[in-house]
Structure formats: structure tokens, C-alpha cells
Amino acid sequence: MSNATKKTTKKTKKISPTQLTMAWMKRRGFIAQIVERWNPFAKVRQDLFQVIDIVAVNEQGDLLGIQVTTRANISSRRAKVRESLGARYWATHNQVEVHGWQKVGPRWTVKVCEMEYDKYKAMWVEKEFEGDTSKKAAQ
């Protein structure tokens, strides 16, 4: 087979929604830690309080519990957070967010849903942020 007929394959580095959120939070001035863990016996990932993948804090003392997913799964993750007693307790004094990532062309975009909780119900405030490229997020 000649060099002219060989197909060149460029490996694209896949980046997870969790890594995208970690990089994005850093650019927003937060330090963050992944708090979900792999349970090798059950062969599942286990989140903090069954809903929090990342905990982030900034210099002002804002403390966020973040559930990370793809844009397509936001509604199911919001329901998961809404039903979680741990998330309710967390949200009484801190922030809970769901980050949903989607690649639009060459750029990653994130939809952020903030949970506002009072003793009667959880309410959601949605914000969209655009312009995070995978190259930028990976740095």
C-alpha cells in the first residue's frame, strides 16, 4: 500500500463534561474538586449525597455543589437533584447547580441551572454560557 492511499486518522481527544466544568470553574475564579467516586464492587460512580459531582469554592466564600451532565440529560439530572434530601440541605446554605454541556460546531456551550430552595419547593434558574472550546477547556 502506497503512502498516497493510506488513510490518515487524526485522534481526537475526548473530554468529559466533568473536565469541561473543572476547567470552566477555574477560569471563573473557583477552586474545584471532583467528589464522585468509582465503586469497584457495585461498578458504578457514586456522587456526594447522591447528586454532587464537583464541589467548588471561590475567594468570596461561595460554595457550589455541581451535578455535571450533557445538555440532553439536564431534565433528568434536575429531577434527581430536586428529589435529593442531601441537595436540599446543601441548598439551604450553599448553591447547587446542574451543568449541561453540548458541542455546537467547534465550541462547547454550557447551560447552567441553579437550584433555589426554600422549605416548600425547589425552583430552578437557568443561564446559558457559550464560547468554551474544547481546546481552551482542556488547558
Regions found by a protein language model. Name each.
Residues 2-139:
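Catalytic phosphate/metal-binding cores of nucleic-acid and nucleotide-processing enzymes, i.e., regions
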